[in-house]
Amino acid sequence: MIKRSNDFSSILENYFTKHLSLERKFSTNTYNTYLMVIRQYINYLSEQKHEKSKSISIYSFNKQNILDFLEYVEKILKCSPKTRNHKLTIINSFLEYAQSVNPIYLDIYLKSKSIKLKKFKLEKMDFLTKEELEAFMKTINIKSKNGYQHYVLIALLYEAGLRVSELINLKVTNLFFLSESPYIKILGKGNKERIVYLNNDVVSIINDYIDKFGITLGYLFLNHSNRQLTRFGVVKIINKYYELSKKECPTLMNKTITPHSFRHSKAVHLLMNNTALPIIQRFLGHSSIKTTEIYLDITNDEVSRSILKASSIIDNDENSKATWEGDDKLIELLENLK
């Protein structure tokens, strides 16, 4: 019989390098999330249970240890029930793979699988009304270089209904604007590809942005160091204009606005414009229409009166175009990107 420690190491390595990466074709973000949770659990065993690293095996994933870990996650780390459930799902995924490799781990997996998910009430996601969107966008100084980039970035978040990961991974090669119906090609969750069509106003400002920034290759949005913009970087940008827009639009004071709020707002606006749910599902890249149905919960009469029609948030005026010229050094750096 293979030693437990060696067996564990081998199964753990193959789970990530072969099963998740090659067989299930996980995206980088999802892969990293799974890796983080398993690492967190192993660190918990080492630091809280005082189990030596060399002695940690699949048998360390027993039901009591997992229950203690989940309690630690909720009570000490203050994670939500939703996060707690997600961590349990990831642990179960690993154990399911382990028992498929070696059936002696079936009992370990079944006992872990018997742990119930915690019920929790779904929090309603805040969305922006048409007026709030306009107020938000007006706080952006598009006459500045950074401001214009932020304007294009946020407009694209909303108009294309993008997830943050989809936005920051968007490359020039994902833009297909010469087509009769311009579109962008998105690689979403689970490496699922989808096409999002854009109206002419959006295409116009993106082309203007590309021209002024001299972008020919690589990622569409870069940070100050000319590196790929990060999720944290997008959050900082949104927070900056959220603080400014609250002063101009008091109704935003009671809302929590995140990068995802723009994707959610677009979905709500489409729904209120009587767009069929299957079309919204396809637009957002949801694998199940049940996920899309979450948006139905917030379409009450009050919201119906506040949203007239899904429309563009871009001011198609010449003044909305950048007035500064591109930086030659920036263009040179972008051209050298691999």
Regions found by a protein language model. Give the residues of each.
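Conserved catalytic core of the tyrosine transesterase superfamily
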Residues: 1-338
